Amino acid sequence: MLNFKEKILITLPSLLISLIPLFLITGPFLSDLSVVLVCIFFLINIFLNKEYSFFNNKFFLIFLIFFLYLFINSLIKFYDFNNLRSSIGYLRFGIFSIAVIYFIEKQQKLLKWTFFVFVISFLLLVIDGYIQYFIKENIFGNPVDIRSLRIRLLFNDQYILGSYLSRLFPVFLALTFLLYGNKKNYIIFISFLFVLIETLIFLSGERVAFFFNTLSAIFIIILINKFKKIRFITLLLSFFTIFLISIYDDTAKKRIWDQTINQIGLDSSKMNIFSEIHESHYLSAYKMFLDNKVIGIGIRNFRNYCHEERYKTHADSCTTHPHNTYVQLLAETGLIGFLFGVTLFLYFIFKMLNHLKGALFKKQYLFNDFQICLLSAIFITIWPLAPSGNFFNNWISIVYFFPVGFFLWSLKN
């Protein structure tokens, strides 16, 4: 039985970690507050119990080097307090990842709590998402704007439902296989939820989210061992459901396929990278890089420099960030920061090829199915050939780092 002190220092932060998938639906405030509180509770526990060995972690060491570079970069390229604050605050994501390891070890129920929070969160979003798509209002009866051909996230005004589902679905999949992999009837039942989620990602009208979900599904099907057939069948059922819905209503099809073909320029003589506007962001970022090759213009500074005439490439080329992680790192952190990202991606590919080689020729798997699902979430985060959100945005950073802690825990155990 945990005493009152342990309930506060262990159970409370464990609950906060498990509630993050639900908090992310509401926006950045509650999820970011939870991350900060988890970090504080973690540090209190570490210093009270003198468990400093948790910092003796290769991931944290590499993260710390990257963080120190960001901090020094923001001092050298100081524009206003915003970029300095962002670099200092970035440390919390590395600490949070280590904290997840700590609290899972101290409170094993954290895994089940997180799973059930995922079930509740996804059920809420599935119900609301399909109501928005077919009835044109949310679950509260408020009308939605159907002209955008996209679906909003519940409790949120942003069109990021597909992004949320596609990035966190692999984590939900991982926990399902870990906790209930031996319960065949349960896996079959939960597979229907998988199909509903994947279909909704398509209906959300978010092209990148649909691409990422398909990419992670292929990644998982190729690399997992025990649940390969289940994942393949659910993907086929999802595509079949999407096909049937598209016959009835081609709203999502227009957004996913027709608009993409038009923006890339496949129906004209001029080809674009993703779209004409995306291409203008990349060209502006590249010009900034050419003027600041080694350390870039400073984190979160794209928005401050893009309005300058020398960097304008299009009427809409100025925005908050260049909409691609690697392009943003190149422009804002220079070659040094960019090499961090590229090295991580190449190392990741190397490990996955080793896993595939062992699976094909030796029937030995470097990673288990739980880890592969988590790695698929990380894979779509570091995938270079797709538009992405602001790398230093709080909400997206939480989504990026959330699976990392669970993966690190699995390596340790």
Q: Which residues are covered by each model-predicted region?
A:
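Transmembrane signal-anchor hairpin modules in multi-pass inner-membrane enzymes, especially those
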Residues: 1-82, 102-112, 116, 175-188, ...
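A membrane-periplasm/extracellular boundary helix in multi-pass inner-membrane enzymes
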Residues: 127, 204, 224-269, 283-291, ...
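Selective detector of the "anchor" transmembrane alpha-helix that sits immediately C-terminal
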Residues: 332-354
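Juxtamembrane membrane-water interface segments that cap and precede transmembrane helices
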Residues: 17, 142-154, 315-327
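Long extracytoplasmic/lumenal interhelical loops at the membrane interface
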Residues: 268-291, 295-333
